[in-house]
Swiss-Prot record:
Belongs to the RRM NCBP2 family. This is Nuclear cap-binding protein subunit 2. It comes from Gallus gallus. Component of the nuclear cap-binding complex (CBC), a heterodimer composed of NCBP1/CBP80 and NCBP2/CBP20 that interacts with m7GpppG-capped RNA. Pfam families: RRM_1. MRNA binds at residues 23, 46, 115-119, 126-130, 136-137. Component of the cap-binding complex (CBC), which binds co-transcriptionally to the 5' cap of pre-mRNAs and is involved in various processes such as pre-mRNA splicing, translation regulation, nonsense-mediated mRNA decay, RNA-mediated gene silencing (RNAi) by microRNAs (miRNAs) and mRNA export. The CBC complex is involved in mRNA export from the nucleus, leading to the recruitment of the mRNA export machinery to the 5' end of mRNA and to mRNA export in a 5' to 3' direction through the nuclear pore. PROSITE patterns: RRM.
């Protein structure tokens, strides 16, 4: 096996992809030690940086490649009850969740880089996002037209291109 390929595969199989992050749920009832214990045995993942248009079916299709998904809970805007850029994916086993952490974290879905992290387990009410609108805080300040992000986006640009008369 070539050196670069071996290094890449060794990295994917290392436990570093499955380590728990420093983030802790502020609403967790219990000590930090107890929360860390739950994170180490959890089969639930927090999935962030999703497009507001990503569907539960897309999440199911992607994450089921790593194992049997028990349930998916889409993050919702508190007021509008519309998707707001995150979800929870619960597997039947920790091993399947570890596969997802290794192979899905950092992949692209709907032109966004998906971020996964361990979660101590979904509890009712956590599907509602944080921030003033209930979405992911970083998305609250975005506008429909954002020069730094390519203007109106690929979909609008394609629609405009299709409306242009053909020149012969």
């Amino acid at each position: 096996m070539s050196g670069l390929l071996h290094t890449t595969l060794s990295g994917l199989n290392s436990d570093s992809y499955c380590e728990i992050s420093r983030y802790r749920d502020q609403h967790f009832r219990g000590s930090k030690k107890l929360q860390e214990k739950f994170l180490k045995i959890s089969s639930t993942l927090y999935v962030g940086n999703l497009s507001f248009y990503t569907t539960e079916e897309q999440i199911q299709e992607l994450f089921s490649k790593c194992g049997d998904v028990k349930r998916i809970v889409m993050g919702l805007d508190k007021i509008k009850k519309t998707p707001c850029g995150f979800c929870f994916v619960e597997y039947y086993t920790r091993a399947d969740a570890e596969h997802a952490m290794r192979f899905i974290n950092g992949t692209r879905l709907d032109d966004r880089i998906v971020r996964t992290d361990w979660d101590a387990g979904f509890k009712e009410g956590r599907q509602y996002g944080r921030g003033k609108t209930g979405g992911q805080v970083r998305d609250e300040y975005r506008t429909d037209y954002d020069v730094g992000r390519g203007g109106f986006g690929k979909i609008i640009q394609m629609q405009k291109a299709n409306q242009q008369p053909a020149v012969y």
